[in-house]
Amino acid sequence: MSRRTVAKKRPVAPDPVYQSRLVSLLVSHLLKKGKKSIAYNIFYAAMKNIAETTSQDPLEVLRQAVLNITPKVEVKSRRVGGATLQVPLEVKADRGTALALRWLLIAARNRSGRNMVSKLSAEIIDASNNTGAAIRRREETHRMAEANKAFAHFRF
């Protein structure tokens, strides 16, 4: 194993419009080929779309969506004897948020639609209402953990 010290978490600067660290994390996951300004434009257009559609605070809709998607448990492969077991583990807060953002964007990209703005806003609205592909992904992860609860004593 490495003898190096554990890398420190770098602080995430809040975004310029909403002053939210969550928005910065989402935009960082959204960007492609380092084009952050385009990612911000897509995100802010999606937030405007959410505000028009739901007539609610778009930041609150986003927070609720991320909260709904965040998994509580996940499974991790562990080799015991000759078999590879799926061991359920609790998800830490930072990892849970990262997984939620990743799943939200994957679901938005896989959605059918004209552009990323409409797909992202529709997925965020669906997730805030506990529907959509990202929510299904979280439920599938929870089902896997529930099915493998017998192996929970194999801690890491």
From Swiss-Prot:
Keywords: Chloroplast, Plastid, Ribonucleoprotein, Ribosomal protein, RNA-binding, rRNA-binding. It comes from the Eukaryota. Signal peptide: none annotated. CDD domains: uS7_Chloroplast (cd14871). One of its GO terms (cellular component) is small ribosomal subunit. GO terms for molecular function: rRNA binding; structural constituent of ribosome. GO terms for biological process: translation. The keyword Ribonucleoprotein applies. The keyword Flavoprotein does not apply. Its main location: plastid. It is found in: Plastid, Chloroplast. Disulfide bonds: none annotated. Part of the 30S ribosomal subunit. Belongs to the universal ribosomal protein uS7 family. This is Small ribosomal subunit protein uS7c. It comes from Ostreococcus tauri.
